[in-house]
Amino acid sequence: MSTAQKAKILQLIDSCCQNAKSTQLKSLSFVIGAVNGTTKEAKRTYIQEQCEFLEKLRQQKIREGRINILSMDAGVSNFAFSKMQLLNNDPLPKVLDWQKINLEEKFFQNLKKLSLNPAETSELVFNLTEYLFESMPIPDMFTIERQRTRTMSSRHILDPILKVNILEQILFSNLENKMKYTNKIPNTSKLRYMVCSSDPHRMTSYWCIPREETPTSSKKLKSNKHSKDSRIKLVKKILSTSILEGNSTSSTKLVEFIGVWNNRIRNALTKKKSFKLCDILEIQDNSGVRKDDDLADSFLHCLSWMEWLKNYESITELLNSKTLVKTQFGQVFEFCENKVQKLKFLQNTYNND
């Protein structure tokens, strides 16, 4: 597709937004993962920014016949990532890899704990960056969950939070600079990927029906725990649905597990009713604390970007149709509203099981 054609699609999306209602813009923002601005003008700006990013992913998928996304939840003792692939003619993405790593134990065999020493941090993140490129295919996009800068109940920045923020920043820089450096070397294969800081709030809002914010700290903490538990439960339901529905094209099936993943999940489902995600990954005790929220978040970040890209592709197809422009715009917002309702139905289905 030419530059002019790409620009035309983005221009059509902006034209679609110009006379839209605020509620319509909110639905569009939601289904493509854009920031929901407080004014109509802000909503339009954020929608355009997200569409420009998704258009790059769409073009890469058209060129290569598939798109690979690797999403990370940064942590020193509980670093988790999920890698998925979506082929041009497949309706659902496939899980290629899913891991949780204790970075200190994997890359610092002779060092007890990571300090705030720049040399140690640099070495650890360099080794991590190289590790992420060991398995093929190389991702077309890396996403890193944006980290908070302080705890909810304190104005002070604690050492663990500081470490994970430093890890996030250096990892982002290493991934960007690895591509820039490699592409300057003559006679070498060029790297083509994007690096994105992925907003945890947008991911959570997409998958978990938002709860009303409360003014008290204790209620906020309970709400936060509820959201975390809901995300873990949701991922478990996505896993079980994927296996139990087999080749079904049910609207509740969102992802494909093949090979070893299929066997591991099936084994977990037959052994006990309540299973941990760590059990599916066959994680041993030395791979950090056996908690599932890091694995769930990396999985949902990756699946979110796959969903947002698929939704964006559907919108571009509607805008590229031969119908009248006004009809196209109406179809876009109808698609967005239907998608929101389907997602709410999906969430209610999973929550009521």
From Swiss-Prot:
Q: So what does mutating R146A actually do?
A: 100-fold decrease in activity
EC?
Answer: 3.1.21.10
Cofactor(s) required, per the database record: Mg(2+)
The entry's Mg(2+)-binding residues are: D293, D294
Q: List the disulfide bonds.
A: none
What Pfam families does the record tag this protein with? Ydc2-catalyt
Q: What is the catalytic activity of this protein?
A: Endonucleolytic cleavage at a junction such as a reciprocal single-stranded crossover between two homologous DNA duplexes (Holliday junction)
Q: Name one GO molecular function term.
A: flap-structured DNA binding
Where does the UniProt annotation locate this protein? Mitochondrion
Q: Which UniProt keywords apply?
A: Endonuclease, Hydrolase, Magnesium, Metal-binding, Mitochondrion, Nuclease, Transit peptide
Sorted alphabetically, the Gene Ontology cellular component annotations on this record are: mitochondrial inner membrane; mitochondrion
Q: Which InterPro entries match?
A: Mrs1/Cce1, RNaseH-like_sf, RNaseH_sf, Ydc2_cat
Result for mutant: Q147A: 70-fold decrease in activity
* Outcome of substituting R231A: >200-fold decrease in activity
What does the entry give for GO biological process? mitochondrial genome maintenance
Result after altering E145Q: >200-fold decrease in activity
* Chief place of localization: mitochondrion
Protein's job: Capable of resolving Holliday junctions. Specific for 4-way junctions. Seems to be important for the maintenance of mitochondrial DNA. Cleaves fixed junctions at the point of strand exchange. Cleaves after 5'-CT-3' sequence.
The subunit field of the Swiss-Prot or TrEMBL record says: Homodimer.
Q: What is the name listed in the Swiss-Prot or TrEMBL entry for this protein? A: Cruciform cutting endonuclease 1, mitochondrial
